């Protein structure tokens, strides 16, 4: 018999024993009570009493009620040391026969298993090894776990199981719990920042008749009552700008977007973004906002502006570098033979891109080719926080053209560690120019570009009523969480990432 077969037999055998224990509990009455009320978390008790010596603790005689999942147990005759885990951390229990009502230890405590959830009332004391411990006077089994924990000693190591059964990952891995606490702090910190700046939080449609606001392939669904196809939104941008037209001069939305595209360590089809718009501001103001926000998040979450990530350390305390797309291509592409003239002529740009092994789409103009060259030769070099600016108008259909060079836009992308974290620009508020750019996107879509934008006539109508000078930005929450949690994959910071169906 193989080791795997032995393991499966042990697993099913243990489950059978646990089911028998649950049946015995049911026979006694309520097997899943909901009357226990705890008054302390493990971490709070450690913070309050870890530095208190045993004699002082004995004098104070603090009474506590704690609850959590049994993670370890060590029986010693008529007493058992148990470690329970709650949302804040772990604490040790001392459960002894002599401290409990007659029969409770033998009949109840001895039947407890790893993974069970228990409630304990007792007195805090220090063991001989100076470990803070709860001496139990009252005990109650709150939930009988029928399935054993996956690995009693090494945690949950299988990556796919961690993603599919995140609850087991959170039980077993302290680092995973820390990651999602950091994610929560990122979201809370962003919300606090924008509300403090006078922005109002809004919600815009997830189901849209016309998906807009980004170049991406949407998910399609059908609304039965209206009998129309609809799309999960790829971005909230066009709705948020309608609100600025309506007089909400500072708005933000923190919510989900959906893009029917590939899955990678950086991409999940369902992801979270903060998108905000500020009237009477330009893209320079938003770059300043972004620096200030990320500096604040680093200090609040990590206590420093130095952010470690893999082999790198990012310094959020210094001003972020700002470089145009053309300058970045020339700076990092020179060793591959890229010269200035290649960036201003379509045929030369195509020839340079082809030498780099870039597959050129028929619908691409000069701007798209230059952008592809940038992605090939320069993007991965933008390690320290860097704002890439002056994107071609062709690839920025919603951004305002630059006053001095209308071939490029007043746009920026924030790169950290060679990855795009955010995208923002001074908004295009010329309704006629916007209509023309939508038409160009329609032509690109007709030519085979699946990610080209749809035309939104209602949005053009809104612009015709007058959009004040405005700038807007979107920041990827998942990628920020990766950054602050030092997580290598986007799946590590999404509680339930998209996975193939398991047969």
UniProtKB/Swiss-Prot annotation:
Domain of life: Bacteria
Family: Belongs to the class-II aminoacyl-tRNA synthetase family.
GO CC terms of this entry: cytosol
UniProt cofactor(s): Mg(2+)
Organism, scientific name: Actinobacillus succinogenes (strain ATCC 55618 / DSM 22257 / CCUG 43843 / 130Z)
Residues bound to Mg(2+) 1: 413, 420
Protein name: Lysine--tRNA ligase
PROSITE patterns listed in its UniProt record: AA_TRNA_LIGASE_II
Subunit relationships: Homodimer.
């Amino acid at each position: 018999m193989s080791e795997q077969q032995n393991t499966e037999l042990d697993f099913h055998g243990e489950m059978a024993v646990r089911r028998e224990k649950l049946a015995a509990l049911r026979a006694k009455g309520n097997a899943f009570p909901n009357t226990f009320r705890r008054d302390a978390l493990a971490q709070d008790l450690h913070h309050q009493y870890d530095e208190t010596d045993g004699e002082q603790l004995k004098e104070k005689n603090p009474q506590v009620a704690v609850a959590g999942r049994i993670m370890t147990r060590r029986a010693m005759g008529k007493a058992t040391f148990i470690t329970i885990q709650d949302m804040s951390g772990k604490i040790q229990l001392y459960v002894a026969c002599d401290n409990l009502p007659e029969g409770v230890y033998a009949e109840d405590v001895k039947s407890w298993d790893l993974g069970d959830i228990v409630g304990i009332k007792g007195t805090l004391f220090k063991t001989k090894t100076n470990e803070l411990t709860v001496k139990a006077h009252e005990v109650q089994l709150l939930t009988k776990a029928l399935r054993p924990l996956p690995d009693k000693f090494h945690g949950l190591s299988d990556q796919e199981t961690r993603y599919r059964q995140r609850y087991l990952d959170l039980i077993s891995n302290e680092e995973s719990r820390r990651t999602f606490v950091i994610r929560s702090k990122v979201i809370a910190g962003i919300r606090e920042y924008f509300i403090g700046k006078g922005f109002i939080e809004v919600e815009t449609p997830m189901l849209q008749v016309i998906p807009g606001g980004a170049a991406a392939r949407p998910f399609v669904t059908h609304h039965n009552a209206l009998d129309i196809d609809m799309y999960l939104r790829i971005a909230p941008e066009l709705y948020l700008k309608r609100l600025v037209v309506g007089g909400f001069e500072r708005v933000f939305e923190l919510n989900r977007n959906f893009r029917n595209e590939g899955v990678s360590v950086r991409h999940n089809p369902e992801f979270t973004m903060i998108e905000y718009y500020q009237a009477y501001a330009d893209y320079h103001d938003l770059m300043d906002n972004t620096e200030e926000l990320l500096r604040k998040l680093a200090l609040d979450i990590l206590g420093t502006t130095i952010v470690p990530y893999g082999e790198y350390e990012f310094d959020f305390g210094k001003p972020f570098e700002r470089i145009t797309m053309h300058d970045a291509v020339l700076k990092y592409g020179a060793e591959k033979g890229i010269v200035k003239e290649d960036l201003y002529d379509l045929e030369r740009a195509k020839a340079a891109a082809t030498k780099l092994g870039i597959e050129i789409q028929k619908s691409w103009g000069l701007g798209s080719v230059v952008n592809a060259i940038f992605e090939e030769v320069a993007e991965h070099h933008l390690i320290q926080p860097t704002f890439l600016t002056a994107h071609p108008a062709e690839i920025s259909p919603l951004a305002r053209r630059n006053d001095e060079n209308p071939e490029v836009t007043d746009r920026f992308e924030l790169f950290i560690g060679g990855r795009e974290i955010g995208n923002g620009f001074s908004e295009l508020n010329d309704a006629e120019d916007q209509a023309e750019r939508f038409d160009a996107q329609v032509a690109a879509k007709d030519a085979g570009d699946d990610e080209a934008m749809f035309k939104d006539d209602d949005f053009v109508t809104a612009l015709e009523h007058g959009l004040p000078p405005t700038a807007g930005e979107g920041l990827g929450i998942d990628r920020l969480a990766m950054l602050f949690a030092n997580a290598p994959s986007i799946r590590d910071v999404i509680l339930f990432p998209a996975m193939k169906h398991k047969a």
